């Protein structure tokens, strides 16, 4: 881990969402955090209070002597804080004006506006957390289901860090033997160390493969399963969206073409996070505005992981229905025969025989058979996923790409040993894999990558 750094200036930011609310929090971190807070706080002498204590008082503008707000101020002294620096958190009444006024007061008295993710970056640089734990901070904030939260918490507690470090140590132990052989060639242990490298490479590859098997589930838990609701106009798409979200996000009428754009919403169905996309009806139209909606719907369909295709069961299949069936044939999909209460011209058995897909019959407005739909969504989500109930998962593309790179480097080591290439040459890829795994945790990550990663965080984190 990195050594604790003390040359940072003092930063400040609003840590709660901007807007009206009961409480807002303005956070400072740095060597002068307590001193600056003391200059604007009327109550206890913050310079003298014990660490990890909270104090009632008022925020005062020293220039005017006027009270800005009453507040509760928390004092946390280094090094036992999130950033390993002195931290002060000012709890004030929620609202844009009062919160921003307090922030500006802190900036005026010597703090600097924090960059996005800078609090978490300081925690990383000061050795409090590694990169996987830093990423988990935002995963907890953005978690869409309880399962996603559990995985993020496990990562914050060092679950993935432990697995990566175990693999790196395995490589390092073998590298030590290789270095001895290179430095003392008279012992003629070249074959032994080459075989050790190959065996270690195989062992680490097995561990990498186990992590990579979690990548698909981890990605979906983090980002949601992009789910397009498609069908002809007035087939019940908006009714389905409203049912799944338990709200009236979409307008439901008997007028075709009511939805002229894509509507998006995140929901949890049986623990599966869905990014629902209610599309405009995909059909031929001469209406210019409706055409735009249809084009956006087609793009939404292209990126969808799952398609919920609605067909009016009370009517014979139309040419447009058949076209949609063909267009979605390559996707994971569930075909929903809606309006079954109006009489069925198409049966579940007929549709299954025609498409080979999962099919249910329902009346969405009457909520008939909707439990079966939710079960099917869960079933399709886990199809092809090795679900071990392990809380340690690979949750983003950065981690996945680096694991693939490390695996490739280790495969090159095995090939080099098989080809009889000298140990000191094969060692290059072996060391490369050790470095690549270190990029996942940040122990060997370039500064540019670290800066780019933390820039994706929001202010105050």
Swiss-Prot record:
Domain of life, per lineage: Bacteria
GO annotation, biological process: tRNA methylation; tRNA wobble uridine modification
Residues binding Mg(2+), per UniProt: 238, 259
UniProt KW ATP-binding keyword: no
Annotated positions binding (6S)-5-formyl-5,6,7,8-tetrahydrofolate: 27, 89, 128, 461
Keyword set, alphabetical order: Cytoplasm, GTP-binding, Hydrolase, Magnesium, Metal-binding, Nucleotide-binding, Potassium, tRNA processing
PANTHER family: TRNA MODIFICATION GTPASE GTPBP3, TRNA MODIFICATION GTPASE GTPBP3, MITOCHONDRIAL
Protein name as it appears in the record: tRNA modification GTPase MnmE
Organism listed in the record: Lactobacillus acidophilus (strain ATCC 700396 / NCK56 / N2 / NCFM)
Gene responsible for this protein: mnmE
